Swiss-Prot record:
Name of the coding gene: lnt
EC number, UniProt record: 2.3.1.269
GO cellular component: plasma membrane
Enzyme class: transferase
Name of the molecule in the record: Apolipoprotein N-acyltransferase
Lineage of the organism: Bacteria, Pseudomonadati, Campylobacterota, Epsilonproteobacteria, Campylobacterales
Native organism: Wolinella succinogenes (strain ATCC 29543 / DSM 1740 / CCUG 13145 / JCM 31913 / LMG 7466 / NCTC 11488 / FDC 602W) (Vibrio succinogenes)
Amino acid sequence: MKFRSILAIFGDFRPKSLGIALFGAILFSLFIYLHHFGITSPLLYSLLALLALAFYLKLPRESGFAFGFWVGIAWFYWMALSFRYYELTYLIPFILLGIGGVYGVLFSMALYLKNPLVRALLLWLLSHVQPFGFDWMVPEVMLVPSLLDSSKLSFGLILLSLSLFWLLPQRWLKPLPLLLLPFTLYSKPFSPSLPPFEVEIIETHIPQEIRWEREARARIIEENLKRIDAAILEGKALILFPETAFPLLLNKEDWVLEHLAQKSQEIAIITGALRAEEGEIYNSTYFFHQGRIEVADKIVLVPFGEKIPLPDFLVKPLNRLFFGGAQDYRASASKPVDFELHGVKLRNAICYEATSAILYEGSPQFMVVGSNNAWFYPSIEPALQRLLLGYYAREHRTTILHAANRSPSGIIAP
């Protein structure tokens, strides 16, 4: 088989087709970058989303693979950046090709049939396709910063109206399906639900390359204790720290545990740290209140970051080859954990898992999230994370209290 014939399987790679694919991918991804740079214009995001979806529905089939390739890289290039900290920088180009290739195949299948209604249905279902368990490809997230509702129902109505716009042959009929769009406007709660007590949400800026060094670790612990003392003086009821804010196996450091338990007599403390038990490592959240300690382990691990999502017989050789024999983290087999403070339940989530539907079982009123985004600094990952958190906050009417390292912390309301 000739090389050109092999390429033809993946579509048309002539400049015109590639240009159309690249333009479509830019439209499909631009909202993330605008959000990253702090652009807040719901009308702009609304128009951009409608234009991106309309363009997608009419994209030439031959441009499908290239479109998906560029979308995959535009959305998820930052995944490769974490390999810098494993001395695997040489793998970054191959990881980017892999990311682009996976989404190139997915979108080439979604765009194989030219009927806009079929394409709309497949895009509507795309968030349920999770390569290796990675579930951040949620197309409707582009509606979160807009005037439009990001629910599945509204997203479906938007896709239906745009599909019918393209399908109706008479020009005078084309505006009629667009009359569905006003029914997809987002109705924001008049008064967002906030915890009935004062919360200090910590934002840190600690580079990943130093956070585990002995000298830096001592300084980080000292700074965290000072932040707790300051929050106590300000009369706060709760202080929320990011993921692994205490960079150690916290359950093995009795003096730190005792210190935090003592301070929790005056203020509740939620912080991220690792936990070791029976030779296994867990990414955990520690809750200190009135001298008591509760621990909740992460239940949804990051594919290829905390766990290699492959059969066990492949995991150990890959860990030896690329990660010096380091073992995967272990996930708790339990369901999501709720901490309780002053009669208020706070659903716990750690970074990546806060963007997984399983953590929103029962639509909790409040969620506390700790993230360490230093792995991907600098990149658009925090912007995409905030959009996804906003998507789930809207979907479940959940108020999210988010403490982060190397990205903005804050409250994300529905």
